[in-house]
Amino acid sequence: MLKKTLRHFSIAAGCILLMSLTQISMASTSKGTANLPSSQQPKDLQDRVRHSLLMLPYYGVFDEIKFSIQGNTVTLAGDVRRPLLKFEAEDAVRRVDGVSNVVNSIEILPLSTADDALRSRMYRAIYSQPGFERYSIQAMKPIRIIVKNGHVTLVGMVGSELDKILAGTAARNVPFAFSVTNNLSIG
């Protein structure tokens, strides 16, 4: 009888210890990155900021938003077509845990029907290239087309040097573009 009571007592004590360790573990992880080593905190913050920007509902193929992080300050840059997107990006980043200050240097592209028509022609020329189906089916298009007063800049990432050249060539063959700058990176 005594052995049975001691066995039940040890099992109960083990369960209580396990539950208390689980609660301590859950409490430490609910604080965000406070329990991570300092070398991982900036990468985690960078991932959370990137995710908050990618989740913006009107962030499209004709917009580019870049960011840099200095301590707890995030600086936003780039070009967007919709004025509201500039402020939505700032608001989304401001709500990320670990961000204390946001500097918004995003430029709003000028309204222009000529630029809108050029954007459409650029999109069709680039994403209808043979072999570019893998880029065109993605929800977040990897090749971004920035048109400002007739000047085109391609930004984003492609899979090879050949894809970069093909995208640049397709863009240069679109009429009414004053210039085309190919800033695509290979990844």
Can you say where each PLM-predicted feature lies in the sequence?
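N-terminal targeting leaders
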Residues: 2-187
